[in-house]
Amino acid sequence: MGTIEGNVAVLKKLREMLSRQREKLEDYLHLLECQGDSIQEGDTQKLLAQVGLEKSLIADIFTLKKVIDPLESLYQACYPAGTESSVPQLQDVLETMGTEIMVRNARNRERLRERMEEIRNEITSLRAWPRESSRFSPAAPSLIDITT
């Protein structure tokens, strides 16, 4: 295989991997949107399932990143800066998506923090201390006779 064919193969593989990473990031963005809705609704079962999916997606993204890094090194060796334009465009899109993920993740963390505070306040209000005694409960003695 000549150098041109090798360069083209590296370019194709890198584009394919970057496209797969973009798809995973799109899935992650959609998942973050669904998580935000679940947090607002207070649906813990959905949120738990989404957290499991999130862990899986993040693992997939990191695996792809491990494959992409060596391909990028080969790409930079094969193509001097500015000779090929599709890969830098894909990388810019991925960077933008990464920023959007950070923003949505921060928003979801804040929503979750607010929801947890609401639940804490609700629990505190349910545990109001001291409680009023019931009419049906026996009266508690309040004086002690120590003369005997």
Which role does the model predict for each range below?
Residues 2-81, 85, 89-92, 96-99:
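Extended, charge-rich alpha-helical scaffolding segments
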Residues 84-148:
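Short terminal interaction segments
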